[in-house]
Structure formats: structure tokens, C-alpha cells
């Protein structure tokens, strides 16, 4: 039985390319967060992904891998789900379906019960994910709402993910996406570094994702963001 990701209010994102201080993994795992997502854009390899997975797998939290490339699409090591992103607001087809096609051409034994497609709307042009995918981040509130509705109602993505990646986003845009989505679960990630920001985005998103704060602000801030949405 795989973990029920639809019930999560708070997810902590850990980057395989970043180092955590000694003892930090246990503190993160006992912070109250609902799940751990192993994800990064740059310098993520199967080796450093596996190293991080080995560190976190002993704590019993639901584990998600969000692969940056087909090589990192793994199903073993105790993970519960593979969240596979498609970036909707790019003209580079590789990030919409190309890498997914390449993955399926080379893969075998895919456990489709573990695979959860994500419709990403990337909104920080200065972020690694924005640069790498060539995302058009100059979207209006109406543009984002339309993308969210296309993802939800037309393509039937189970997750719509508003990604500001490293910077705190516009709550009005997240609200518009929330109002446009009827069936999908709305994720928000980007720049949450306080309980107030977590609560603000948590009013509109079903699930907030906290990542950089773990490395830059510390465990007390992470715990505060958990309390704000649970």
C-alpha cells in the first residue's frame, strides 16, 4: 500500500546535491512534516540520490522521488511514489513530454501505481529550473489560472504545482490557480521561510513544499511552517 499523497499538507524537499549537518535528517523526520521529497535540478545523479535515500529511509516517513532525469527515476529503496513533472509553460517539448518518452523507451518494469504526474507552472525566471527548462515566467494571474485549468480539466493531471523555486511567490496567483482547479491537488513551492508565509500559501494550496529553508534557516523554522498548516 503506497502512502496517500492527497492528504499531505506539508512536504519537505531535500536536494541530493546539498549537504545536511550531522543529525539534521532525524530532526527533519521528526518535525511533523507529512513526507519527504527528494528532488533537485542541478547535479543530481543516481549515486547522490541513492546516498540521500539511504539517509532518510530509516525514519518511516513517506518518501517521494521527483526525478530530474530518466536516470533518476527509481522505484526501489523504500520510496512510496515517483512524482514526474511536466513543465507546461515552456516551449521546449523535452520538458513537457520528451524526457518522459525517453524514459519509457529505456525503462522496464515500471510500477505505474507509484507514478504520479505533476503539471508544473514555473514562475521564477532566475531559478535553476526556470533557466534549464526555458519556462516563460512572465505569466499573468489569468495565464496561470488557464494553465492550471488545462492541466486539471483537459489533461487530468493529479497534481498542479505552482513553482517559485527559491523565491516567495504571489499569493494572488496561487489563489487564482486554486480557484481554477477542481480535481487536482494544488502544490505550492518557493521561498517559504516563516510560519506566516506557510499559512498564507496554505490558505490556497492543498500542499506546501518547504525546501531551501531547511538548509538556510534551520529546523526551528521548518517546525514552524509545519505547525502553520497542520
Swiss-Prot record:
Sample GO molecular function, one term: magnesium ion binding
PANTHER family in the cross-refs: HEPTAPRENYLGLYCERYL PHOSPHATE SYNTHASE, PTHR40029
Source superkingdom: Archaea
Protein name per Swiss-Prot or TrEMBL: Geranylgeranylglyceryl phosphate synthase
Main location group: cytoplasm
GO cellular component: cytoplasm
Catalytic activity, EC: 2.5.1.41
Protein role: Prenyltransferase that catalyzes the transfer of the geranylgeranyl moiety of geranylgeranyl diphosphate (GGPP) to the C3 hydroxyl of sn-glycerol-1-phosphate (G1P). This reaction is the first ether-bond-formation step in the biosynthesis of archaeal membrane lipids.
Cell location: Cytoplasm
Pathway as given in its UniProt record: Membrane lipid metabolism; glycerophospholipid metabolism
Family from the record: Belongs to the GGGP/HepGP synthase family. Group I subfamily.
Chain sites annotated for binding sn-glycerol 1-phosphate: 13, 161-166, 191, 211-212
GO biological process, one term: glycerophospholipid biosynthetic process
Cofactor(s) this protein requires: Mg(2+)
Catalytic reaction list: sn-glycerol 1-phosphate + (2E,6E,10E)-geranylgeranyl diphosphate = sn-3-O-(geranylgeranyl)glycerol 1-phosphate + diphosphate
Residues engaged in binding Mg(2+): 15, 41
Keywords tagged on the record: Cytoplasm, Lipid biosynthesis, Lipid metabolism, Magnesium, Metal-binding, Phospholipid biosynthesis, Phospholipid metabolism, Transferase
Amino acid at each position: 500500500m503506497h502512502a496517500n499523497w492527497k492528504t499531505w499538507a506539508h512536504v519537505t524537499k531535500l536536494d541530493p546535491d546539498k549537504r545536511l549537518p550531522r543529525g539534521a535528517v532525524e530532526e527533519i523526520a521528526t518535525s511533523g512534516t507529512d513526507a519527504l521529497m527528494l528532488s533537485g535540478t542541478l547535479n543530481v545523479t543516481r549515486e547522490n540520490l541513492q546516498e540521500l535515500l539511504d539517509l532518510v529511509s530509516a525514519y518511516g516517513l513517506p518518501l517521494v522521488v521527483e526525478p530530474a532525469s530518466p536516470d533518476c527515476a527509481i522505484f526501489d529503496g523504500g520510496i512510496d511514489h515517483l512524482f514526474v513533472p511536466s513543465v507546461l509553460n515552456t516551449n521546449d517539448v523535452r520538458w513537457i513530454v520528451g524526457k518522459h518518452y525517453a524514459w519509457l523507451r529505456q525503462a522496464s518494469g515500471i510500477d505505474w501505481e507509484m507514478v504520479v504526474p505533476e503539471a508544473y507552472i514555473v514562475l521564477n525566471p532566475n531559478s535553476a529550473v526556470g533557466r534549464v527548462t526555458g519556462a516563460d515566467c512572465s505569466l499573468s494571474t489569468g495565464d496561470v489560472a488557464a494553465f492550471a485549468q488545462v492541466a486539471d480539466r483537459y489533461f487530468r493531471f493529479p497534481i498542479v504545482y505552482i513553482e517559485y523555486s527559491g523565491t516567495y511567490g504571489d499569493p494572488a496567483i496561487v489563489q487564482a490557480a486554486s480557484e481554477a482547479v477542481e480535481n487536482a491537488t494544488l502544490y505550492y513551492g518557493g521561498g517559504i521561510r516563516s510560519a506566516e508565509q506557510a499559512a498564507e500559501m496554505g490558505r490556497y494550496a492543498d500542499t506546501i513544499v518547504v525546501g531551501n529553508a531547511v538548509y538556510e534557516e534551520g529546523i526551528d523554522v521548518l517546525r514552524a511552517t509545519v505547525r502553520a498548516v497542520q
